[in-house]
Amino acid sequence: MVANVLKRKISLRIKRKRRIRAKISGTPSCPRISIFKSNRTIYVQAIEDINATTLCASDGRKLGIKANKSGAAVLAKDIAGKLSAKGINEAVFDRNGYLYHGVVAAFAEALRENGIKL
């Protein structure tokens, strides 16, 4: 029973992810910031979809943070610094099928506070 519930939950997230990705894409001047969260950590990438390259990436394991709101704020500050060093101050936020709530919302707000326009 539990395995079926988890499969359904993950498959619904992947459906949401595909609907979102059909509508957004990243350019060199305005990359797509994709977030992935696990139970232990958060992973973030700034992706330029035209050439299919990752401009910069950061994750909670390297920074030694947990997958909570305060950890998301630290991660946002790190990725905003990397983007600013490349001269990028605008991006498209890809929530990757997750609800815009909790850690995902805290990450997006912290990005805005650190000077990245979403």
Swiss-Prot record:
GO terms for cellular component: cytosolic large ribosomal subunit. SUPFAM superfamilies: Translational machinery components. Keywords: Ribonucleoprotein, Ribosomal protein, RNA-binding, rRNA-binding. GO terms for molecular function: 5S rRNA binding; structural constituent of ribosome. One of its GO terms (biological process) is translation. It holds the Pfam family Ribosomal_L18p. It comes from the Bacteria. Signal peptide: none annotated. This is one of the proteins that bind and probably mediate the attachment of the 5S RNA into the large ribosomal subunit, where it forms part of the central protuberance. Belongs to the universal ribosomal protein uL18 family. Part of the 50S ribosomal subunit; part of the 5S rRNA/L5/L18/L25 subcomplex. Contacts the 5S and 23S rRNAs. This is Large ribosomal subunit protein uL18. The lineage of its organism: Bacteria, Pseudomonadati, Campylobacterota, Epsilonproteobacteria, Campylobacterales. The gene is rplR.
